[in-house]
């Protein structure tokens, strides 16, 4: 698999993909390549203004790309629910779910639901999103879920006694914990 490149992506015409965090980094590049190979890509983004710019940039490189910009804030589980509901109203299939959105090594903050931000955004929201979309995923032949992780998972530890980092907080330990929760394959 180490020699696998974008050129190895099969024809994705007729396929639907969701990429969280699609406006920058790995999410942006993945969105571009999935679209280049014919998929309809739902760009799930927290900041719609940045999402619109990313969408325009992709359309410059991949004219005719089938993109659908939708709001998703992984720091708020009500936004995750709203996204899943809106997606299921528009689409009856989901071939690729790429759980990519994330935050890295930030000062301690909490999500709208009171979870430590890195664990909430990097793992819990994606876990919830996958569960909310499981019906459409299982009804789509050959559907795949890919959760982007990090090599930080290899050094991460789950602190079950202080999962939310309320007693002691290290931004890198919290990041490693969030990535270990969704380990690399």
Which residue stretches match the model-derived regions?
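Rossmann-fold NAD(P)H-dependent dehydrogenase/reductase core
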Residues: 2-185
């Amino acid at each position: 698999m180490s020699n696998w490149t974008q050129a190895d992506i099969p024809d994705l015409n007729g396929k639907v993909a969701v990429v969280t965090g699609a406006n920058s980094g790995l999410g942006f590049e993945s969105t571009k390549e999935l679209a280049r190979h014919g998929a309809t890509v739902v760009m799930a983004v927290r900041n719609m203004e940045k999402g619109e710019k990313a969408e325009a940039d992709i359309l410059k490189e991949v004219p005719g790309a089938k993109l659908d910009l939708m709001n998703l804030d992984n720091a708020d589980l009500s936004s995750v629910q709203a996204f899943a509901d809106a997606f299921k109203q528009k689409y009856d299939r989901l071939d690729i779910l790429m759980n990519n959105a994330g935050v890295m090594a930030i000062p301690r903050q909490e999500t709208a639901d009171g979870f430590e931000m890195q664990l909430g955004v990097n793992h819990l929201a994606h876990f919830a999103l996958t569960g909310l979309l499981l019906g459409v995923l299982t009804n789509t032949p050959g559907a795949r879920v890919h959760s982007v992780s990090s090599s930080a998972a290899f050094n991460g530890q789950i602190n079950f006694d202080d999962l939310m980092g309320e007693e002691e907080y290290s931004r890198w330990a919290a990041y490693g914990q969030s990535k270990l929760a969704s380990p690399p394959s």
